Amino acid sequence: MTDKPDLTSTTMLRMILDYAGSVDEAVELVRKYDLHDSANTSFHYMVADSTGKSAILEWGNASDETDTDGTKRELKVYYNTDDTILGETEDANKFQYITNFIVTPDYYSDEKDMKGLDRYNAIESKINPDGSNTEGIISAETAMDVLELVGRRKWDASNGESDKNTITVWSALYNLTDKTVTWVSNEEFGNEKAVFTFDFEYLK
């Protein structure tokens, strides 16, 4: 905790969308605030812009076992152009991705506590299966396939789990060049009534 103003995570996201025109501007904005821990948990988000730059923003402290005081959490920023610390695969790739675990090294003492690690690895394997697509350039169709692959209900079912209450409520594919977004509700990728495309013409 510092003398910076407190900010909740949802308000922070709204602030970035309203006032940041690039990754650098987003990071500059976020650094002006302390993230208020209303959910008693660590946080991370990823931001990107139309230049291809991205960054993972993580708020944590020490380790998963001791990270219980939100006032002690600090922001760490990992850019896609400088994330060697995250691992060899992340260093080789020029694209980033996150699921439901903190990517900061040594945060977890046991890999089983890294919730979503299996889906994290699946994303990389789908985008860069043979190691040659380090730029992460894929078609919109393939990007949607990735989102469908790692939806919680489908993923759990394919791995022998049957919690029917687990589902990815919505998935979205953003085209930061064309300023469009394709939005899918409740993993219903094959249902045209559940797939919506929005064109943010006013941003062009």
PLM features per residue range, with description:
Residues M1-D18, T41-F43, A48-K204:
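C-terminal, well-structured catalytic/ligand-binding subdomain of enzymes
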Residues T10-D37:
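Short N-terminal edge-element motif at the start of the domain
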